[in-house]
Amino acid sequence: STCKMDIICQPIGTYTEEGFKRGVKNMPLPCEEAFSVNADLLKTIFEDNDVFNFQIGYLAQNNNIKAMVDGDKLFSKHIAVVGSTGAGKSCVVAKLLQEAVGFDNGLNKNKEHQKNSHIIIFDIHSEYTNAFKLVESEKFNLNLLNIDNLKLPYWLMNSEELEDMFIESNDQNSYNQVSQFKSAVIKNKIVKNNNSNVNYDTPVEFDIKEVKNYLENLNRERVDKKDKRTPILDDGTEVEDRYEKYFSQIFEFKQSDTNNGPYSGDFTRFVTRLETRLSDERLKFLLSPKKEDGTSFHSNDFQDILKQFIGYIDDNKSNITIIDLSGIPFEVLSTTISLISRIVFDFAFNYSKLKHISGETNDIPIMLVCEEAHNYIPKSNESQYKSSKKSIERIAKEGRKYGLSLMVVSQRPSEVSETIMAQCNNFIALRLTNTNDQSYVKNLLPDNIGSICEALPSLNPGEALIVGDATLLPSVVQFKMPNPRPKSETINFLSKWEENWREITFEKVIKKWRKETTT
């Protein structure tokens, strides 16, 4: 007896003497013969194409055939890398970036001539440092920024970031708080920079402690009982200009023959919040950062602050900048990411505009890698993520025009901002076990890739479905392990539990917890 099988096929391209092209002009007739593609033809389709010049791995069904993509389209258009915990996301990201900057099995192919790649990684769990540290003889300079050496003075924040940091949006006096805080910041910027042409968002120096003094004086203020306007200090001095007087120190006010000032008692919680923030040792990197010589940052240090993010650190040019956010307190994570993202975008925007004047395009394109993206650019509209979402969504919508692309990495793609995911042109999907995430990713992908998506929950570690503008065909690819590897190994609980009892130096843990210096 003859065994009959029904095979459901999806036409995806046409192969002729001129080679393979995506898309089908003339559909085959029902009675025409069908053949399976042999290995030689697959090799021709995937490897014999000059446009597809960047290897990302090997075809999962035949590991003798290289999986090639268009490198320009891969990195110049936003990429989403998604997959459940343990599927191999960190290794895939590390391998892609190692190939992009010229790593070859732990060696630096470009050590004789520095190349022009600029990649910034938001590293939430301190995983990627290991993946980009080579021996000194390979001459690869990794630019590692963390809470101890990050130069990020608070006066670079814009209005939204400042208010996220210092003002409770649900406080009944939040309107007055914003109004007076804004006025004080602008006035202090004018004083500190001797320039009246500044606004709330101008990235120039101001003194947050002086702003706090101003607000506390408003909160204490007593005014003349007769005119009900003029503040009177305890020594009888009449205050003619609040800004000129109140920045310098906190004053006592005359109690007799005076009334409460217009904001008396209204800012008590606000001032307490400011004091709490300013005294928090964990926030020193942001609220009281110091240069190497121990002095504070000023407006004319802006160039050095900017250069750290794109790899221009003194003479140590760096293709990879890792921003290790593992030590950043969660309550300011969104603000920190927003500030850095916005600085990088504004640089790319203004550099591109300068190039456009002379008819050129941006010649130092930058990729921003958002690891664990669901933690700070979520789909939800919670106020604590407002600033980071706004900054990165702007990059997603406008960045490519100015030479700034995104790589969005997440184990929960269904929880990432839809605005950002919808702007991704290339998808690398590793094993996904959550049905919501599977459905979400399927809805983002083209309709014509058919049942290949059904493989998502059963992919092996390091295997990924590759779809997008950079690929010749939707394919399941096996990525090779990066060398060196990121530090993302799972702790072996049972093995550790079976070891002998370990003592803990609790003092060191607590010092680290409090961000004190450990010895």
Protein language model regions, located:
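Conserved AAA+ ATPase small/helical "lid" subdomain
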Residues: 176-200, 454-485
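Conserved ATP-driven motor cores of ASCE-family P-loop NTPases powering translocation/secretion/packaging/pilus
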Residues: 168, 393-478
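Conserved P-loop NTPase motor module
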Residues: 461-519
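Hydrophobic residues in beta-strands of the RecA-like P-loop NTPase core, especially within AAA+ ATPase
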Residues: 122, 370, 409-410
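P-loop NTPase motor domains
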Residues: 126-130, 155-391
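Glycine-rich phosphate-binding loop of nucleotide-binding enzymes
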Residues: 55-145, 418, 466, 497-498
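Basic- and hydrophobic-enriched, low-structure N-terminal and domain-boundary segments
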Residues: 1-83, 91-92, 96, 105-106, ...
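Short loop/turn elements that form and flank the Walker-type P-loop nucleotide-binding site
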Residues: 75-76, 114-116, 316-317, 361-364, ...
